[in-house]
Amino acid sequence: MSGAAEARQIALYEYQPGRGACYPADFLSGFHGYLQTDGYDGYNDVKGVTRLGCWAHLRRKFDEAVKALPKGARTGAAVTGQAYCTKLFMIERELQGLPPENRYEERLKREKPLLDEFRAWADARTVAPKSKLGQAFVYLANQWTPLTNYLLDGRLEISNNRAERSIKPFVMGRKNFLFANTPRGAQASAVIYSVMETAKANALDPYRYLLFLLEEFPNADRRRADWMEPFLPWNAPDDCR
């Protein structure tokens, strides 16, 4: 999924036969830029990218640690860690709408000290690594560099929630059509979802856009090098909106 700052949004689904590190490395071969993911280690072999972590995943782990507390308990390290994450998201909401350069500066001024304080506080704690709280601390320590790399550029986001949301339609659809019988079927589903979700991400009406493609695509002059340009979502006619 493209970053929120990109004018031309792309939601790209890709079927792979497994979750091994070779698949994202192959898929993203040649790409250079920022890559925001969860903490899955399979992305570690992707070359030429700057990894960004997801603060929503970390906050969720502290949320789980708070839920594991005895009934009525509202103090302790789990609550404090949760509060740090909540404060960070509150500041982010206040910075929404700022130009990237201003958001970059405000983050350094307001969020960098909070992050330094959070890390120092976490480093001073000793918790059982297999407990819910321990899992949150392990995630924080292992993912700290990706988690804080969003400070590098004001266009970047602190979570990959947008990508997570783009996955939801496919997950819901899969429950209805009960998976794919063959790899070719899975690949076809990935193509359809890529087209539809990219259309939605660019404020198009998916039905009207698909109708436009089905009616006009067969008549395209494929001898032209730029034959596909008129069909891209950002070049679609107004009646697709």
Language-model features, listed with the residues they occupy:
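Catalytic center-proximal scaffold of phosphoryl-transfer enzymes
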Residues: 1-241
